[in-house]
Curated annotation (Swiss-Prot):
ATP binds at R53, T66, W419. Pathway: Protein degradation; proteasomal Pup-dependent pathway; Protein modification; protein pupylation. Its EC number is 6.3.1.19. Catalyzes the covalent attachment of the prokaryotic ubiquitin-like protein modifier Pup to the proteasomal substrate proteins, thereby targeting them for proteasomal degradation. This tagging system is termed pupylation. The ligation reaction involves the side-chain carboxylate of the C-terminal glutamate of Pup and the side-chain amino group of a substrate lysine. It comes from Rhodococcus erythropolis (strain PR4 / NBRC 100887). NCBIfam families: pupylate_PafA. Mg(2+) binds at E9, Y55, E63. The active site is at D57. This is Pup--protein ligase.
Amino acid sequence: MQRRIMGIETEFGVTCTFHGHRRLSPDEVARYLFRRVVSWGRSSNVFLRNGARLYLDVGSHPEYATAECDSLIQLVNHDRAGERVLEELLIDAEARLAEEGIGGDIYLFKNNTDSAGNSYGCHENFLVARAGEFSRISDVLLPFLVTRQLICGAGKVLQTPKAATFCLSQRAEHIWEGVSSATTRSRPIINTRDEPHADAEKYRRLHVIVGDSNMAETTTMLKVGSAALVLEMIEAGVSFRDFALDNPIRAIREVSHDVTGKKPVRLAGGRQASALDIQREYHAKAVEHLRNREPDPQVEQVVDLWGRTLDAVEAQDFAKVDTEIDWVIKRKLFQRYQDRHGFDLSDPKIAQLDLAYHDIKRGRGVFDVLQRKGLVKRVTEDETIDDAVENPPQTTRAKLRGDFITAAQAAGRDFTVDWVHLKLNDQAQRTVLCKDPFRSVDERVERLIASM
């Protein structure tokens, strides 16, 4: 499948600092954030005009699920649009707090762990054909995903009883299973719960919940693009060396703690391989695969950055990727800060900087400052992100949903939508079932819109 439907779900961390005596719980802060949403959507679980879903997840975490996308740069634009949507809610909620005499600053973090050690996720979704062997996908994908943090982790300072150490991934410490149907209780790497949000006879949805939330657009593109390419190769019958891991959960932590990528992890049957070895194998296959594939500049960009990142890790010389890979950007930031102020990695100021990197409010978040200074590379533009805030992808089913929502709101009509259903809540209860996520034109939807 060279044209694939993809999407990213991001849970955001919420906190609030108060100027006055009154303090609010995270639940109350989340309710302030969603008050505007509830006022027009009558719920804290809504679909937006751009085809995305916005809702309040378990544990007061706002979650934004992008609309269905079929290209990487389109997906990065819609992922960034989620930050803008949440930032608008934040500004609105702060204004309401001020009006009610509760002075406070609300912070939304696009990260994966809070100070209390709780974890929340960034989930990638890939449409796969029902016909393939799902177990083969899992077997080949698992070693790739366990070691992928080497090229696209968000980076984190981990405080241990002995000392503070810099790790590649925020999520690695919180993953407890390889493949499972649960998402919160056990946190697997690949979630197998079968909800395709499409024609179930034709498709499955691969739900990857091991990735970090990325701030750098190039890292997001590499994270999703490399996984999509490995999937494509599995579907094309490319054979891979057997890197079955002895213990994926131990391996994911060991890889996260080793920025050299060279420490061996145990494979099944007593063999060993390093994260670098494993990633090199997948990358080499990708380079080979591109020779026989239709040219695609976005995919070529992914494979190029993938290779350069592995070269940088191997040489421990990061100058060639220190504007493109989140954990490298963050580590460089910490090192400069430590050199300037003589801080140890365990200093609370470093933990503060770690958090501020993920603050999505423009003008305040550290990543935004770096971006404005041209210290991080981009693949989008402000205008294309603004467009993604307002409009759905024009090439997928999201266009049908977005057009329907826009028309129903303009006509003042009551409606209900989810990923596959569009329903007008009138006497006739007319409903259109959209089972093909690749289809952006549908006469039934056009008729439903025309009837409003």
